[in-house]
């Protein structure tokens, strides 16, 4: 028999069962997607889209449905917070059901093709020999893929026949599903511009349709056909793996660095938004604008959306996860309940002090307070006997603006220190750690898991491409033949069915 790593060679000269294997694989993928969607719906809590969004709950397939326009449930809730809605058939449950039904039909098709493997379709009508016209099949597949790509861009995304896609502002506050017009100018190449997604699907679809028709109608030159081994099914495998690993690298990048197709409302913020103080700068800009228009500090900070403040918290940074830390973010720091408000620290001279924030890759970080010039004015010392900047010595107090503790000031050092320790993580929130038995160790968001998985798959598939590409290009070199072997062990197509001695020609 064959060793376990060579079992797929039984499909090399057997188009019928190659189709069956692919149908079964698609059935498994569609079945997984539908089942996973139902599992996530069973565990998803839609009650607080601001402080307990899907990405905090570790949802993996829901955000992908939402970005394509599915936002409602047959239970009447929507991910944007509405209740009592009627989403029609294309709800989360409807999509899950469609995938499970598709999976069942594909399973039956796989069984049929496994039993009826020897079809007239796979034989050359001129010779009666088994033969596949691979260049023509490539053209047909390219044409169909181009048609799908064009249809998705021109109809689904534009809203002409479909819902559009998830569109939001740069700070992930006002997202919703909207029809999107294509952006044909240079701004279409901005990865954060949804119009570019539409334009590129339309353009790529047209190119795919034209290229597909070309490959259906035009035969490859003989020298090129032989040089690229176009008659060998392993060439198809090698080039297909190349396409897939390239796509996996691309989506790992767009997910980790962020793009219009990976909105932060659905997948959580990127690590670079914490690293660059992206949300902190926007919050400060809004506060300064409010103060300039005559608002008090309390009013200015109370106007900051809780959603924006929550993004400015290190626990939502996907780089704060870790290997083997399974589970959703809520299993780490807990389920966020409320924003405590913005903490402002001052020393006994009344000078405002700023807590230095923890960089992404630190697990622990000292509590250091600096003035506006970056000069250290207070800290929580490791060795109290030698301290000069302790909270007690510097008379540090904390006042809260906005949030639950709006307008309150605390002066007792233990309380002030407890808030300073929390302030190194960004804005301060109250968490429920009991419901999920949260352990206090940060987890990554679906953004981190998706990136990690696709980077790993891409690397593995890259080696698969090299392996199968080398095998198809150098097959004659690799398969050096022992002259003592009998013809049936050597000759391709000696048996009509591989390994079946009853089908000898």
UniProtKB/Swiss-Prot annotation:
Chlorophyll a 3 binds at residue 22. Chlorophyll a 4 binds at residue 25. Gene3D superfamilies: Photosystem II CP47 reaction center protein. Pfam families: PSII. Chlorophyll a 16 binds at residue 465. Chlorophyll a 10 binds at residue 156. Keywords: Chlorophyll, Chromophore, Magnesium, Membrane, Metal-binding, Photosynthesis, Photosystem II, Thylakoid, Transmembrane, Transmembrane helix. This is Photosystem II CP47 reaction center protein. It comes from Thermostichus vulcanus. The gene is psbB.
